[in-house]
Curated annotation (Swiss-Prot):
UniProt KW keywords: Acetylation, Isopeptide bond, NADP, Oxidoreductase, Ubl conjugation
Gene3D superfamilies: Glutamate Dehydrogenase, chain A, domain 3, Leucine Dehydrogenase, chain A, domain 1, NAD(P)-binding Rossmann-like Domain
Gene that this polypeptide is encoded by: GDH1
Protein name: NADP-specific glutamate dehydrogenase 1
Organism: Saccharomyces cerevisiae (strain ATCC 204508 / S288c) (Baker's yeast)
Covalent link Glycyl lysine isopeptide (Lys-Gly) (interchain with G-Cter in ubiquitin), residues: K325, K371, K433
Catalytic EC class: oxidoreductase
A matching Pfam family: ELFV_dehydrog
Length: 454
C-alpha cells in the first residue's frame, strides 16, 4: 500500500538521525526505529448519517493510536475529503515526537473522517459528529486517548463531539481538548498554535542576532487564513511586524503596506461561514479602505516583495523547492512552519543548504520545523488536560506564560541536541536535526524503560 505522506515524514526523521552521530554514540537507539514506526493500534470504522435531503450518507472514520509511552494518545481529528490512512499515519507519527517536545505527559495519535462539511447545515454537521462519536467513544477517554480539533473540526464540532461523548458514556470528563470556555476549555487555546509559532520564531531571531533584533520592523509572509494563520498574524502585528500575505485554497491576498488587525478580524468572522478570501475582499469595507491584491489560484511565496520571515500556516507540502528558492532570493532569513510538513523535502533542502553553507549571520537562512515550531496548540491542549483533571481554570496570563516557557524550552532543546550530535552549521545549528534527535531520544528512553523495546 502506497503511503507517500507517511513515508515522507518517516524518512525525514530517519535522515536526521542517520546524518547525526546519535547511532554512533548510542547504537542501541537504532532498534527503536522499526518499533516506533508501527502504530500501536489503528481503528477504522463506518460512519453513517442522514443528510438534510433525507438521504443516508456514509464515510470512512479513523483513529490512529500511534504511541502511548509518554502518556495518553493525543492528537487532532480532521474532517476533510483528503483524509486517508497515509495522511493520518504521517500526522500521528509526527505527533508522537512533537508532543514529547512539550515536556508534558502525552503520547501521539491522530484521527478523522473523510467528509466535506462545506455547504452542510449546522443540524447535519451535528448529526455527523454524533455518528462519528458513536464509534469513537468506545476507544477514547481522559487517561486513554484525548483527541482535539484539526482541519474541519473547530469549536462547533468539538462541542457536538463532546456532547455526543457525554450522552453515550454518561460521563463528563476531559476527553477532548479545544472545548468551550464555559464547559472545560482553556483560555488561549484557539490562539495557541499561532502564538506559539511566533514565540518560537522570536527565539530563533534572538539566538541568531544575539538579542539585537525582534519582529519589530520585519516583513512577514504568512499562508493560510484559518486559526493558526489568523493568530500568528495578530501576534506579529502586536510585536511590530508587517504581515504582507494570507491565503486560502482558492488564492492569496498580498498587501505590501501590511494587512491590518481589523482585516484579520473580518477574515476570522467570515471564515466561520466558509467565505473565500476573494469574497471577503470584495464584501468587507476594511479591504476597500486598505487595499490588498487578490491573486486567484496562487500561493503567496512568489508574489511578495522583500520579506524577512515566512510562516507557512495552511497545509502540507505548500512550499515547493522553487518557491523556497524564491523566498531566499527575496531575502527571507527565518522560516517556521505553522502547518504540518508545510515544506516539501526539496524546499527543506534549499533552506538547510542556505543555513549550512553560510559563512556569516547575514547570509544564513534558518528553518524551524513543524514538530517544534507549531507545538503550541498541543501544548495548551496538555495544559487544558491538566486544568480538567484539577477542575480549575487558569488565567489567560498564566496559560500564555506557560506557552512561552514551553516554546522557549523546546527551542533550547533543539539547539542543545543539534550541537551535541551534529556538526553541519558554521553559523547556526540545524533545528530540523535538533528537533528530531531530541524528540526521538525522549520517546526512545520511555519505550526502553517500559519494555516496548528490548
Amino acid at each position: 500500500m502506497s503511503e507517500p505522506e507517511f513515508q515522507q515524514a518517516y524518512e525525514e526523521v530517519v535522515s536526521s538521525l542517520e546524518d547525526s552521530t546519535l547511532f554512533e554514540q548510542h547504537p542501541e537507539y537504532r532498534k527503536v526505529l522499526p518499533i516506533v514506526s508501527v502504530p500501536e493500534r489503528i481503528i477504522q470504522f463506518r460512519v453513517t448519517w442522514e443528510n438534510d435531503k433525507g438521504e443516508q450518507e456514509v464515510a470512512q472514520g479513523y483513529r490512529v493510536q500511534y504511541n502511548s509511552a509518554k502518556g495518553p494518545y493525543k492528537g487532532g481529528l480532521r474532517f476533510h475529503p483528503s483524509v486517508n490512512l497515509s495522511i493520518l499515519k504521517f500526522l500521528g507519527f509526527e505527533q508522537i515526537f512533537k508532543n514529547s517536545l512539550t515536556g508534558l505527559d502525552m503520547g501521539g495519535g491522530k484521527g478523522g473522517l473523510c467528509v466535506d462539511l462545506k455547504g452542510r447545515s449546522n443540524n447535519e454537521i451535528r448529526r455527523i459528529c454524533y455518528a462519528f462519536m458513536r464509534e469513537l467513544s468506545r476507544h477514547i477517554g481522559q487517561d486513554t486517548d484525548v483527541p482535539a480539533g484539526d482541519i474541519g473540526v473547530g469549536g462547533r464540532e468539538i462541542g457536538y463531539l463532546f456532547g455526543a461523548y457525554r450522552s453515550y458514556k454518561n460521563s463528563w470528563e476531559g476527553v477532548l481538548t479545544g472545548k468551550g470556555l464555559n464547559w472545560g476549555g482553556s483560555l488561549i487555546r484557539p490562539e495557541a498554535t499561532g502564538y506559539g509559532l511566533v514565540y518560537y520564531t522570536q527565539a530563533m531571531i534572538d539566538y541568531a542576532t544575539n538579542g539585537k533584533e525582534s519582529f519589530e520592523g520585519k516583513r512577514v509572509t504568512i499562508s493560510g487564513s484559518g486559526n493558526v494563520a489568523q493568530y500568528a498574524a495578530l501576534k506579529v502585528i502586536e510585536l511590530g511586524g508587517t504581515v504582507v500575505s494570507l491565503s486560502d485554497s482558492k488564492g492569496c491576498i498580498i498587501s505590501e503596506t501590511g494587512i491590518t488587525s481589523e482585516q484579520v478580524a473580518d477574515i476570522s468572522s467570515a471564515k466561520v461561514n466558509f467565505k473565500s478570501l476573494e469574497q471577503i475582499v470584495n464584501e468587507y469595507s476594511t479591504f476597500s479602505e486598505n487595499k490588498v491584491q487578490y491573486i486567484a489560484g496562487a500561493r503567496p511565496w512568489t508574489h511578495v516583495q522583500k520579506v524577512d520571515i515566512a510562516l507557512p500556516c495552511a497545509t502540507q507540502n505548500e512550499v515547493s523547492g522553487e518557491e523556497a528558492k524564491a523566498l531566499v532570493a527575496q531575502g527571507v532569513k527565518f522560516i517556521a512552519e505553522g502547518s504540518n510538513m508545510g515544506s516539501t523535502p526539496e524546499a527543506i533542502a534549499v533552506f538547510e543548504t542556505a543555513r549550512s553553507t553560510a559563512t556569516g549571520p547575514s547570509e544564513a537562512v534558518w528553518y524551524g520545523p513543524p514538530k517544534a515550531a507549531n507545538l503550541g496548540g498541543v501544548a495548551v491542549s496538555g495544559l487544558e488536560m491538566a486544568q480538567n483533571s484539577q477542575r480549575i481554570t487558569w488565567t489567560s496570563e498564566r496559560v500564555d506564560q506557560e506557552l512561552k516557557r514551553i516554546m522557549i524550552n523546546c527551542f533550547n532543546e533543539c539547539i542543545d541536541y543539534a550541537k551535541k550530535y551534529t556538526k553541519d552549521g558554521k553559523v547556526l545549528p540545524s533545528l530540523v536535526k535538533g528537533a528530531n534527535i531530541a524528540s526521538f531520544i525522549k520517546v526512545s528512553d520511555a519505550m526502553f524503560d517500559q519494555g516496548d523495546v528490548f
